[in-house]
Structures are given as C-alpha cells and as structure tokens.
Curated annotation (Swiss-Prot):
This is tRNA (adenine(58)-N(1))-methyltransferase catalytic subunit TRM61. It comes from Cryptococcus neoformans var. neoformans serotype D (strain JEC21 / ATCC MYA-565). One of its GO terms (molecular function) is tRNA (adenine(58)-N1)-methyltransferase activity. It is found in: Nucleus. The lineage of its organism: Eukaryota, Fungi, Dikarya, Basidiomycota, Agaricomycotina. One of its GO terms (biological process) is tRNA methylation. Disulfide bonds: none annotated. Keywords: Methyltransferase, Nucleus, S-adenosyl-L-methionine, Transferase, tRNA processing. It catalyses: adenosine(58) in tRNA + S-adenosyl-L-methionine = N(1)-methyladenosine(58) in tRNA + S-adenosyl-L-homocysteine + H(+). PROSITE patterns: SAM_TRM61 (PS51620). Its EC number is 2.1.1.220.
Amino acid sequence: MDIRKPMFHSRVHIEAGDIVILYMARDNMTAITITPGETFHNKYGRYPHDMLIGQKYGSKIHSPPPHPGYVHVLRPTPELWTLSLPHRTQILYLPDISYITMRLGVRVGGKVIEAGTGSGSMTHSLSRSVGPSGQVMSFEYHRQRFETALKEFESHGLTNVRLQHRNVCKEGFGDAQGVEGVFLDLPAPWEAIPHAVKALRRDIITRICCFSPCLEQVLKTVTCLRSEGFSDISTQEVLIRTHELVTPPPNTTYLSSISSVVSYLREHEQRKEERRLLQIKTAKENNRKVKGIEADDAIPVEGETGSKRKLEQPSVTGSDNAAPANSRPKTNLLWTEPPNTLPSTVLTKPSPEMKGHTSYLTFAILYPESVRLSMVAQETSSRVETPTNITKAPETHSQETHYSEGSEIEKIGAMTSKEMDDWMKSGSTSLSI
C-alpha cells in the first residue's frame, strides 16, 4: 500500500508530490498534486508545475505571457479541502463540521466513529482533530464510494483513519470498541443507534450526533435515542450569514480615530447622566405640586359647595401647569442631543447569495451505566413519594425534544473527571455533591 506524505503539514516551500490548493476566488478553488512536467490550465492562464516547485505557500503566481491571470497557491487544510474536493455525495461544510466537533468533544488521542463516509469532508476534519495518536473509524456501505475514498485517504496520508465497507444499520460496527463519540450521516440513523451503543465506552460520558435533512427523520431518531437510554437530547440547525467587505476609496479618512470616538462616548454618557438627574428633579417638583393641589382641595371653603369648588379647580390647575410649560424650553436644553457629525460609511453588506438549510443536527449524551441506574432509582423513589390521590393522564410516547429540569444531571455535568471516577468507585447511589 503506497502511502504518501501527510496532506496536512507546516512546510514553508512547495515540493514535488505535495497537494496544493489553487485559489482563484472565494467560491473557485482547485486541489492539484504537484507533478514535475505537468501543467494546470484554466481560463486565467496556464501554470506549469515546475514553476510552482520551490515557491512559498501563499504566493501569488502569475501565468506566463500572453495570459494575464494569476492564482494563489495555498497549503491544504481541512477547511480548504472541503471547498475544493470532488463531490461524490452531498457534503458537510465548515459551520456544521466545527459545531459537531465541539459538541462531540473530539479531542487529540480520542476515538470516534463516522458512519457515512461519502466524499470524506468530515473525515479529513476528524482526522486532524484526533491527531496521530487518535483514531477515526469510518464506515461506507456503497462499494464504489468506499474504494474511491480508500485510495484518497491513502494518497493524503491519513494513517489514523480506518475505513471499512459495511452496512452499519444491519451489520453493526464490527469490532469497534472504546469509542468516545459517534457521528451518523445516514438515511435511517435510528437503525444504527442500537449498534452504536455497543461501541461506546461505558466508563465515561459519551456523545452521539445524527445528521438528518428532514424533521421526520429527527422525530424517529429522538424516539430511538430515548429508548436506548440517551439523555440531554437536543436538535440544532446551523446557518451562516456571509458579509462582503466594502473597501473605501483611497486617500480618504472615512473612519474616525479611536480617541475621537472615545471622547464622543464620554460626552454622551455625561449628557445621559445630566438628563437622568433632570428627570428626577422634574418628577419631584411635579409630585410636590400635585400634593399641594390635593391639600388645597382638602381645605373646606366657607359658603361654597363642593360642586362649585370642583368647577373652579380646572382654572387653578391650568394656572399651575402654565409655569412648567413655559419653562420647558429651558429644560430641553439638556435633553437635546448635539447633531452627529460622524460620517456614515457602509463597510460591509450581506452577500446576495448564501447557503441555506443543510440538515438538522441531533445531539445526545449517554451516561455510564452506574449513573443511569442511580438516576432511575432516584426517579422511582420520587414517584413513590408522590401523592396517589392525584389523577394523572396516561403517559404517551412523545417525540418532542426536551431538556432535563432536574438537578441530578446538572450535578453530574459539573463533575470533573476525577470526581466522576471517585463517585463511581464509591458505589454510592446518592448524587449529593
């Protein structure tokens, strides 16, 4: 088996046999293998591979005359490979990949399962995340895609990826054991979840993620996860909003200095405080006047009836309110904001074309068996303490994803690995920490 040098490296200069990314535009990239004697052609020009050997990664390479084009030669990364790989299936992009990697807790030296290799976009990212000491076990049921992916992984030097041709929904994950995380990109992930439980580690908290484009798939997946003992089930959709930067014209000062902006903010805060004090003062004066009017109304007037007193009250109230009305322009002097002299400049605008919905990501956590048994025992005891004279509706199997409201899972989640090991070794069923 011919395994080439690793695809992901930190070398400075381009060498023969390297895989490089030719960057033409943000949505136009091509991956090539540097082979002496060959030439890359595109609408911008021609680029002999011999001309690229020895150049620094990131260099701007111009096409020989008469073509005026140029390309940037970039060092490959999983992110760039995702944007330039040959599509054999629908692939995952960086927003989903990064979120899945974070939620699964993929770490250096870890062991993860990927079911549904496809074009290998997720596989390359997982390979980099686990590092040389970790392992990615990837499964693909389609024979032709499996063979193509196997050759690709070998040529890219992904020695920590173990690819197998297997239908995991029917045959399971084989001898895979001690796995910390599982990612299922399958049409029917609920058929593979029972097999995934057998491959997960039983002594630590493990996680699973299911990638499904339709809500009907999500509902079936959630039902299966609950039946298999998973907790903290949640579903998210990751959307990205692309913005384009607008370059201001040259030799212009559209942006103010930091000192001027800081000075403006300080003056604004000072005016806001003065306005607040003025409002407090005005409110106190109004309350004092209202109390004075009420006190005058309470004094009995000789020879006058109460109805006559009420008829005269509007004229008195109007004369009292005239003074604040006349003095309002004076108080408004502190309320008036000075005109904003800062120029308004557009520096960014939303891209006219952006990717929309890809799929729904359903995550769940599987606690160690001893923890789950203690949680079930505590739930049972709490049910026994519940008064029996309350008539409850029969429980139904709901497919709505919800979150635990109890404090037990929160306590377990707050444990460190050492506290978790000590608690499990003690054999205690009490979760009071």
